């Protein structure tokens, strides 16, 4: 039976690489915090983009999708769900908003976690209770054969396991046995190994990640979608989960791969936020000049959508004019056709 000993688990993960990643996150956080007050309009725009991207990506990871126009309308609450997928998307939107707006009042305790799950499935009425039957985590190989990858905590032990998990985590934070950035991924991995719900465990784990980061003062997920970063590198996400969950029941789990992955996602998010703040921060640089600067900083091709994402305050029309001008100068060339069209620096 697994024991939730965060003092011991935290000590085991403090390898040189993890310490280096922790220091990098702290450094980025400090640099970004100093400049947050200087770009309120940008941050508001980034918040809206992050909401859409987070809702889309976290659901897409689980195979829950809709069209881009429908997704945007759902996130902006300009329409109502038409089917089960859209019900689950709308539920995620609501819980994500609650997490960002009221995180200081939502403790990581079983009653609150159950309420979050209830709201996640508010449009279908299927949430808000621990699993009643055992579940398994399986995978399909190249030949189409399904294999059991991990057997979570059985249903009859789930309530006790969640109580023990939350108590151990709360005590670890109160006693400061380790930095929150170490304790949070330990908690999330344990949550996923318990797999306490019949459905929605992956999405709940990402909502809980955002909640715990916000409560600890690391609110980069407000402006840069952590879910989007995870979705863009799902192989690393699932690989780290598999590596760290091995031997979990026998207290032999190696949390390091998942902690490394978690900190890497945060560094990517802070790096992206700093780049966007830098792009706006240079008042003397024109918008076309900022588009050109993106190509100077990029080693690979950029699509119009990439530029729009990195410079949300620049209109699509301005981006298209800048691209046309840069092609005329011979600074960039166009590659691909149709939706695959991208642009790359000529000397790249």
PLM regions and their residue ranges:
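FIC/Doc superfamily catalytic core
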Residues: 1-348
């Amino acid at each position: 039976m697994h024991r939730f000993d965060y003092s011991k688990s935290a000590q085991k993960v403090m390898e040189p690489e993890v310490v280096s990643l922790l220091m990098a996150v702290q450094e980025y956080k400090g640099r970004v915090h100093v400049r947050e007050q200087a770009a309120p309009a940008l941050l508001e725009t980034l918040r809206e983009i992050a909401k859409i991207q987070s809702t889309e990506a976290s659901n897409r990871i689980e195979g829950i999708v809709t069209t881009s126009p429908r997704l945007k309308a759902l996130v902006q609450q300009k329409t109502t769900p038409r089917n089960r997928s859209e019900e689950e998307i709308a539920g995620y939107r609501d819980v994500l908003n609650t997490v960002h707006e009221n995180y200081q009042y939502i403790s990581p305790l079983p009653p609150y976690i159950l309420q979050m799950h209830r709201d996640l499935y508010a449009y279908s009425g299927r949430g808000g209770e621990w699993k009643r039957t055992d579940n398994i985590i399986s995978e399909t190989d190249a030949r189409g054969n399904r294999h059991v990858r991990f057997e979570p905590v059985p249903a009859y032990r789930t309530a006790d396991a969640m109580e023990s998990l939350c108590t151990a985590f709360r005590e670890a934070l109160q006693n400061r046995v380790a930095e929150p950035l170490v304790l949070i991924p330990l908690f999330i991995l344990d949550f996923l190994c318990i797999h306490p719900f019949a459905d929605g465990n992956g999405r709940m784990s990402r909502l809980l990640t955002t909640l715990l980061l916000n409560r600890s003062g690391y609110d980069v997920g407000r402006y840069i979608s952590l879910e989007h970063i995870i979705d863009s590198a799902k192989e690393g996400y699932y690989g780290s989960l598999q590596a760290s969950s091995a031997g979990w029941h026998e207290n032999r789990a190696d949390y390091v791969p998942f902690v490394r992955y978690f900190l890497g996602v945060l560094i990517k998010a802070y790096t992206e936020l700093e780049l966007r703040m830098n792009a706006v921060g240079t008042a003397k640089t024109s918008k076309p000049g900022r588009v050109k600067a993106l190509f100077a900083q990029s080693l690979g091709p950029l699509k119009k959508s990439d530029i729009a994402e990195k410079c949300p305050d620049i209109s699509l029309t301005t981006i298209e004019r800048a691209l046309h001008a840069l092609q005329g100068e011979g600074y960039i060339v166009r590659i691909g056709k149709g939706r695959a069209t991208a642009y790359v620096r000529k000397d790249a």
